[in-house]
Amino acid sequence: MGLKGRLFRAATRMLFHSHAMNVVNRCANGYELSADGSAVVFPYVRKRRGRNLQILIYHRVNDEGDQFFPGIPTGVFARQMEYLASDWNVLSLEEALERVKQKDVPDNAMAITFDDGYRDNFLQAFPILKKLSLPVTIFLATGVIGTGRMLWHDRVFSAFRETRIPFLEGIPNESDHHDLQTIESKLTAQGKVLRFIWSLGEDDRTRWIDWLVTKLQVPGHQDASKTMLTWDEIRLMHRQGVSFGAHTVTHPILSKLSSHRAVEELQQSKAAIEHELQAPVRTFAYPIGRREDYNEDTKRFVREAGYACALTTVPGTNTDTANPFELRRATPWDEDIAAFAFRLNLMKWSS
């Protein structure tokens, strides 16, 4: 961590353990502190800003220390959830959406989501969420649930993690070969490869990843049965209040697909979850989820498939005027709880 990062952590810890965090929180909610420290409400601030819904996005919670696809350490996740339970109004995604629709978003509104369907969501995150009675929605890429297959990006992560070759040549738009002799150099090459893959259509993506796995001299197929959730685990969590949404079948970038294939991915993932849980699925999250990964046609296909909303990975919060098919989410990068708390309050204030 550089000097800037250390200074940020020191400053946020000081704020977190002082009265100043309350100032940030009250200002974000449309309050101003009077001289004696009491809160004075300014309704015009609320009217101008509205009340924001924040949605957090997680993928993995574990203590593996995998630098190629890092998860949130279990202890850090527990502290984050304890903070949310004590200081925020954590709603189920379904309730949060209804409150947005009714323009009745409460103060400090928060929803918690996970993408993809990793097994550590059940083994590590679920016990913490259950203990704290916090609602959560998990978006499933159904093609890898209970199949032993890996998501395409996990194939890339695994290939770079396991390869022992000293360098890689052949990355399009890259003139030089890439050193792979250190973790840092592998991560640099992995980042460039992912950016290239994101630009490809579905068939080209599959062919190129197959080429990459062969080039890096790692097994072409790896069993992911211990990595992804099973339907039995999903049903157990569902019976205990966890909500599940769709995240397509194969985790493609929808804007790169033909209309027919995009509709297939949306309909089939929804149908698979509804069949397994015998319950309607109304929520969806775009794979990758950047602005360029969906478009107006995509949003229309999502709506016509019967979903009530779609979540992006575009950073930010959501007001009661937000487009339900373009909801923003925040990624909780900060492992330091003071920085985590400060950043959430700052986002609420700055939105």
Regions found by a protein language model. Give the residues of each.
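Extended, charge-rich helix/loop segments that form flexible
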Residues: 7, 12-14, 19-25, 31-35, ...
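Acidic/aromatic-lined carbohydrate-recognition and catalytic surfaces
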Residues: 106-177
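Short, catalytically relevant binding-site loops at active-site mouths
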Residues: 145, 250-252
